[in-house]
């Protein structure tokens, strides 16, 4: 799918919180588990005073009264001193604590009971104060933080004193500046793409074309310019032999976010109409005649609908053992003869020499077989139009404003966005991140990243890993052999924090982008050079073993991931910031924020897909049958639970989101257990002022407020049919309604919405 069609971010502000009085019910002084409270001290003092009074003279009573007053003053001083010294009975009044307390209070909705709807309780205030910005289909913590990171990068790249010893960093600035040259881009108009189409052999929609050029056009579009018509080809670690890279082929070729948009035509009629109008408008902008262009684009759309029909839904592709098929190129040729695979792959991976025996991993043999049949029965003119349309999709974001305006109309229908107000610089930062993300990351890390954060994050990961492994020991459904192997896998998980080391070594960084030519004069040509360069990088990887230095996210990215073939978890510098993490925030918030993210990624090693990989990152069956059956029974509970949730009357797909739901639930539990272990070692923290929450409760509020989010109905629908994650609301409600710790600390009775009675637990 075109990069520009991915979700757009935005900005907003927090709401001033009108304080509600929850303190009587949940004051840290009263609800702390098992400790003496201020009330109990007062009761004890009153009992002692009664014993002092009896039948005595007036003088004795006066003296006794004076003694009692003095004793009371002395005891008050002692109590005050004790409270001051004991952090569990004092309040944190540092500037950081006051600021974060204010933000938490602004986000809360105290008009809602936490046992009724914890998401609304935690995020209601935030939602009221954060309407969707224009041009955005969703707005959340991740978008806000990415906006902040982009502003930092803008400052770094536009600094007039910019001076770097790294050629890669200089290329990054040149690329960014070329993207900002709106006047030149407008002056060139559609000419750069029209010239490229003519160079490839023409397009039936805009002029003459070579009728015998299917393979040549396929090689150019999918090879030189890295579009993905019909299928996608890439080089990556072999899932069953993770120490080596291998050619991999998978299904692809749809422009809209999901096959559902093509096949459920009644529900998506507006989207399909808007998509066809978009196709026609771009065809006309490139020189086509309106009537002829509409007729031919309708044929291309019908071809995409046929592709959607044979595309396997994501929820049916979760078992990689079943969809992984290793074969030779000659076997692939027999499976899908419409493409000359040796010719195509040899071109794609030039200058490597490939033979018929070269191994290839195919994900979805049935799809490739059917797509081959579809190619063979489709008219050459339609095939040509479809191939060039894929090239057009790939490149129009580098053209003038007319193409962007056409896309905005499609985005409004598809995602519910209004006219975009995204400034050009922000678009250019995103493009630069896509093209030279690690060179950009070098600038970002040197300007912003605190090395101490990396050390603290390392410590947190180890604490969360230990907590997860303790949970393994408590599982009654897992046999000892599988349990031991699971613990070994958890021990072997490799963590990467902040950034790969090579980005701070100028020569190593320059080597990564060696061969990529960048000019400040032509943004379009820079993008073409990037596609060609990425194809060469892919070819270079095939004969090399996978490297841990190859990250799948840039350092400035606000996200994290687990990679099963390396058995590694990665946390870029971009996410190691508030509200996920801050060194001067309470540990309850850090464990509830970045700690849950860490636990989430670690648990992915043991979700329904990650569990298929062993500690070395190889896809193989290492579970005993009885434990596997028990695991599947537990995950079935979670699948059914999430399938009951609805957004705007539309149900979640509990199977599609299963892996992420397992990770959310397991990550929360591991992070909370790690927080409890930290408290046992270091003692209670000072509570935040005014929030009226124990630190245990604060952990869960911190977790929930990370997911405060607003979204258009159209974007919500898109998420339900494409996203492996549950919607933000149910990432909170689903996870916490399965947490015994949450239910205990908030006292939610069985039968309340947050405590339906049946808990689904996997890890």
From Swiss-Prot:
Family in the record: Belongs to the peptidase M13 family.
Q: Which organism is it from?
A: Mus musculus (Mouse)
Keywords in alphabetical order: Cytoplasmic vesicle, Disulfide bond, Glycoprotein, Golgi apparatus, Hydrolase, Membrane, Metal-binding, Metalloprotease, Phosphoprotein, Protease, Signal-anchor, Transmembrane, Transmembrane helix, Zinc
Concerning Gene3D superfamilies, the annotation shows:
Collagenase (Catalytic Domain) (3.40.390.10), Neutral endopeptidase , domain2 (1.10.1380.10)
Q: Which gene encodes it?
A: Ece2
Q: Which residues lie on this side of the membrane: Lumenal?
A: 82-763
Cofactor(s) recorded in Swiss-Prot or TrEMBL: Zn(2+)
Instruction: Please give the residue ranges for the topological domain Cytoplasmic.
Output: 1-60
Q: Which CDD domains match?
A: M13
Name of the protein described by the UniProt record: Endothelin-converting enzyme 2
Task: Tell me which residues bind Zn(2+).
Answer: 600, 604, 660
């Amino acid at each position: 799918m075109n990069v520009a069609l991915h979700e757009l971010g935005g900005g907003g502000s927090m709401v001033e919180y009108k304080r509600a009085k929850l303190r009587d019910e949940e004051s840290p002084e009263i609800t702390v588990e098992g400790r003496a409270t201020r009330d109990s001290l007062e009761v004890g003092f009153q009992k002692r005073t009664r014993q002092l009074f009896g039948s005595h003279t007036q003088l004795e009573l006066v003296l006794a009264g004076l003694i009692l007053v003095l004793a009371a003053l002395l005891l008050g001083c002692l109590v005050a001193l004790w409270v001051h010294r004991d952090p569990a009975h004092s309040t944190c009044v540092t500037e950081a604590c006051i600021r974060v307390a204010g933000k938490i209070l602004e986000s809360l909705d105290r008009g809602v009971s936490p046992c009724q709807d914890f998401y609304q309780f935690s995020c209601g205030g935030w939602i009221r104060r954060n309407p969707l910005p224009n041009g955005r289909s969703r707005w959340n913590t991740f978008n806000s933080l990415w906006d902040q990171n982009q502003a930092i990068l803008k400052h770094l790249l536009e600094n007039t004193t910019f001076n770097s010893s790294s050629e890669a960093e200089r290329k990054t600035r040149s690329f960014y500046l070329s993207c900002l040259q709106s006047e030149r881009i407008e002056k060139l108009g559609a000419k750069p793409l029209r010239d490229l189409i003519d160079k490839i052999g023409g397009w039936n929609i805009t002029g003459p074309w070579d009728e015998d050029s299917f393979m040549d056009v396929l090689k150019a579009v999918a090879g030189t310019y890295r579009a993905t018509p019909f299928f996608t080809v890439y080089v990556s670690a072999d899932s069953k032999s993770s120490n080596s890279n291998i050619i991999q082929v998978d299904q692809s070729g749809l422009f809209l976010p999901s096959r559902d948009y093509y096949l459920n035509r009644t529900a998506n009629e507006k989207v399909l109409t808007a998509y066809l109008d978009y196709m026609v408008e771009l065809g006309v902008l490139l020189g086509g005649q309106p009537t002829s262009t509409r007729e031919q684009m309708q044929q291309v759309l019908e071809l995409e609908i046929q592709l959607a029909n044979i595309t396997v839904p994501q929820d049916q592709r979760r078992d990689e053992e079943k969809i992984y098929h290793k074969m030779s190129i000659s076997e692939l040729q027999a499976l899908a003869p419409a493409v000359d695979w040796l010719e195509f792959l040899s071109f794609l991976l030039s200058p490597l020499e490939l033979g018929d025996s070269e191994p290839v991993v195919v994900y979805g043999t049935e799809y490739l077989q059917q797509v081959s049949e579809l190619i063979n029965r489709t008219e050459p003119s339609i095939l040509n139009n479809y191939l060039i349309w894929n090239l057009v999709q790939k490149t129009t974001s580098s053209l003038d404003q007319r193409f962007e305006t056409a896309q905005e109309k499609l985005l409004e229908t598809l995602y519910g966005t209004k006219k975009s107000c995204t400034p050009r610089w922000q678009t250019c930062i995103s493009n630069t991140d896509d093209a030279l993300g690690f060179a950009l990351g070098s600038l970002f890390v040197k300007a912003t990243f605190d090395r101490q954060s990396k050390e603290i994050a390392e410590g947190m990961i180890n604490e969360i890993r230990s907590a997860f492994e303790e949970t393994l020991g408590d599982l009654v459904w897992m046999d000892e052999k599988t349990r031991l192997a699971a613990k070994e896998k958890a021990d072997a998980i490799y963590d990467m924090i902040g950034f790969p080391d090579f980005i701070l070594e100028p020569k190593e960084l320059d080597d990564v982008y060696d061969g990529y030519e960048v000019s400040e004069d032509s943004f379009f040509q820079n993008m073409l050079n990037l596609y060609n360069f990425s194809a060469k990088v892919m070819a270079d990887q095939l004969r090399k073993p996978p490297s841990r230095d190859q990250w799948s996210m840039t350092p400035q990215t606000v996200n994290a991931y687990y990679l099963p073939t390396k058995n590694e978890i990665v946390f870029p510098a971009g996410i190691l910031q508030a509200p996920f993490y801050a060194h001067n925030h309470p540990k309850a918030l850090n464990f509830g924020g970045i700690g849950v993210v860490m636990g989430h990624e670690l648990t992915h090693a043991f979700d329904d897909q990650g569990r298929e990989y062993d500690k070395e990152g190889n896809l193989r069956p290492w579970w005993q049958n009885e434990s596997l059956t028990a695991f599947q029974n537990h995950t079935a509970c979670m699948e059914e639970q999430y399938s009951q949730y609805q957004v705007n009357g539309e149900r979640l797909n509990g199977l599609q989101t299963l892996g992420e739901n397992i990770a959310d639930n397991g990550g929360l539990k591991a992070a909370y257990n790690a927080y409890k272990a930290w408290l046992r070692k270091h003692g209670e923290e000072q509570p935040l002022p005014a929030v009226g929450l124990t630190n245990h409760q604060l952990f869960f509020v911190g977790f929930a407020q990370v997911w405060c989010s607003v979204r258009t109905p159209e974007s919500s629908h898109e998420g339900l049919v494409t996203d492996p994650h549950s919607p933000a609301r149910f990432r909170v409600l689903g996870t916490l309604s399965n947490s015994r710790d949450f239910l205990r600390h908030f006292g939610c009775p069985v039968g309340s919405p947050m405590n339906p009675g049946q808990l689904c637990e996997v890890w």
